Amino acid sequence: MTKQVEIFTDGSCLGNPGPGGYGIVLRYRKVEKTLAEGFTLTTNNRMEMLAAVVALQALKEPCSVILTTDSQYVRQGITQWIHNWKKRDWKTADKKPVKNADLWQRLDKETARHSVDWRWVKGHAGHRENEMCDDLARSAAENPTQEDTGYQPS
C-alpha cells in the first residue's frame, strides 16, 4: 500500500534577489521531520520551488502526497502552466524562455514519481505548519551556506 505523506513548504528571500532559504515539514503518520537550507543569492520563487523539489526528493519511495504551499506560482505552475511550457519546449506563449526552467524540470520529474495533491494556504495567516516552514526558511536565509547555481539574474 502506498504511504500517505503530508508535506508543507515555504521559501523566503531577504531582498529579491538576495539571500534566501527554504523550509519543509514532512509528516508521515504522526512523525514530523523538518528540512531547511540557505542560499547566498536567489529569489523567493526559486526558494518556493526548491522547497517542493527537495521535499519530494526526500521521499525514498513513491508516495501519495498532499503538498501544501503558500505559493500560487508553484501550485499553478506545476498543475496548469507546465503542460504548455513542455509542449513549447520550455518557452512561454510569447516565445521567451520559461523562468526557472531548471527547477520546473526537476519539480516535474519528482512529481511524476508520486501521486501529488497540490494545496494552497494563505501565508502568514496562522497556519501552524506554514508558520513553521516560514520560520525555518527565514532562519536558513539569514545563515546561507549554499550557492543557487541555477539562479540567473535578469
Curated annotation (Swiss-Prot):
Quaternary structure per UniProt?
A: Monomer.
Q: Chief location of this protein?
A: cytoplasm
Which Pfam family is one of those matched by this entry? Answer: RNase_H
Location of the RNase H type-1 domain:
1-142
From the Swiss-Prot or TrEMBL record, give the protein name.
Ribonuclease H
Q: Which organism is it from?
A: Vibrio atlanticus (strain LGP32) (Vibrio splendidus (strain Mel32))
Similarity comment: family membership: Belongs to the RNase H family.
Q: Which reaction does it catalyse?
A: Endonucleolytic cleavage to 5'-phosphomonoester
